[in-house]
């Protein structure tokens, strides 16, 4: 075992990476494999309500010596303010995003509520791509669907 996080999909990726590195060292792969970035792997708890997270917590950033307001900021949004949550009667929960300053890259994200384990995927990808939250992300799934229906 390599170590945490002890998740089946992580173990599968580690095994594939191991085989790729062996193949690369033997000259059977034309590029060096990209190392795993464990900070972009979401953790999901399939309970009710669901809980999901990716990246750093505020505590971890403070332990690294980063300061809230100077190095990062935190935004939190309740499910109770989302139209979809109201329509589906699943208003319990929130989304919390920790973004770096000054760029606005996603340092961490935490979701508690209905479909949290699905919603975390977009924030995991944003973290992986170092997407800047200061820009509006387009297209969003809902706007894409709406535009397709108009065609």
Predicted feature locations:
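Short, flexible active-site loops
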Residues: 1-4, 38-46
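Anionic group-transfer/hydrolysis microenvironments
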Residues: 2, 15-16, 98
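Flavin (primarily FAD) binding-site architecture
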Residues: 2-5, 21, 122-123
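Active-site metal-coordination segments of metallo-dependent hydrolases
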Residues: 5-9, 55-56
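Generic hydrophobic secondary-structure packing signal
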Residues: 7, 11-14, 118, 122
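Internal hydrophobic alpha-helix adjacent to the cofactor/substrate pocket in enzyme cavities
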Residues: 9-37, 66-71, 130
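Flexible, glycine-rich terminal cap/loop adjacent to redox cofactors
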Residues: 26, 41, 46-151
């Amino acid at each position: 075992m390599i170590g945490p996080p002890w998740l089946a999909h992580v173990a599968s990726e580690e095994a594939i990476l191991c085989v790729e590195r062996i193949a690369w060292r033997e000259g059977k792969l034309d590029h060096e494999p990209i190392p795993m970035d464990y900070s972009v792997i979401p953790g999901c708890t399939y309970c009710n309500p669901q809980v999901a997270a990716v990246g750093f917590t505020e505590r971890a950033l403070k332990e690294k010596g980063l300061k809230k307001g100077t190095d990062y900021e935190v935004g939190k949004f309740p499910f109770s303010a989302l139209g979809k949550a109201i329509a589906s009667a699943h208003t319990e929960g929130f989304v919390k995003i920790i973004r770096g300053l000054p760029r606005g890259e996603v340092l961490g994200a935490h979701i508690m509520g209905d479909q949290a384990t699905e919603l975390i995927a977009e924030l995991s990808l944003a973290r992986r791509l170092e997407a800047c939250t200061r820009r509006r992300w387009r297209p969003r799934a809902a706007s894409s669907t709406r535009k397709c229906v108009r065609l």
